[in-house]
Amino acid sequence: MKFIKSSHSDKVLGNKLGFSAEYKVNKDVTLCAATDGVGSKAILAAELKEYKGLGQDLVAMCSNDLLCNKAKPLFFLDYFACSSVKSKQYTEILKSITSACKKINCSLIGGETAEMPSLYRGNHFDIAGFLVGIKENHKNLKISKGDLIFGIKSNGFHSNGYSFIRDIIKKNKIDIKRAIFNKQKLSKLIMKPTRLYHQLISNNDLRYIKTLSHITGGGIYSNFKRSIPKGTKFDLKITTLPREYDFIKDNINITDMELTEIFNCGIGMIFIINKKNYSKFIKRNLFNLIGEIT
């Protein structure tokens, strides 16, 4: 929508990657801002009355986008909307948000709570987050043929694909509260919180990383393409899917390629480095070499 740009000053650097937007305060300071929610994972949380990881989902959806701009989180605000505030639900979500903020050295400085019984029913609610960070002063590194593509493992489905998951549960009449999958409660598997990648990638690491891609809605390929120049050729090898994807495949006819267009498929963050920096990352837990720029 072009009319939005009419509100911009010359300090707005834009949102070229589509992950977070940049605003140049002065020659030394560039701020980045991101906003997101947890989608229909909130509906499952309400049905299961399981909220302890949902605040981390919210913070991670914003902070992982911010990381793609090589920014360090500064402060976070939340928005909570419901029919009426229920103490356990509200408190557990806020505690989870607070805990996640502390994990990435970010301050929860405020928020808004809205009670709207005409819009929300029963236990249902929605949450949104707003995060501001400061961009680290790193050189822009050009992507070249032979560069290596690394993936960092996800922690389950993160916060995307839940409309699809809920549809599977409904059509197959699965009792989500009692179902067991791979020797654990299915509800526990499905509600794992989104990983906070600022905990795994340091400011020093960013000196060697050319681009980062947060793998969210739309899956692996579409999100990866957002972080590289149009027309860049690459080879990605997504070989073995995590066990939780057997739950999807056992209950609906879907190909692995179709899964990569919806889910993170076990990879929550992708980044590119020069091959000479291979040894700096390959031995790390959760890090895997998954491809190459061709």
Give the positions of each predicted feature.
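A generic local secondary-structure boundary/capping motif
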Residues: 12, 21-23, 64-65, 98, ...
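Flexible, glycine/proline-enriched loop segments at strand-loop-helix junctions
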Residues: 49, 82-88, 148-156, 185-191
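Acidic, glycine-rich active-site loops and adjacent beta-strand->loop/helix elements
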Residues: 37-39, 79-87, 112-118, 133-136, ...
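A structural signal for short, well-ordered beta-strand segments
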Residues: 76-78, 129-131, 269-271
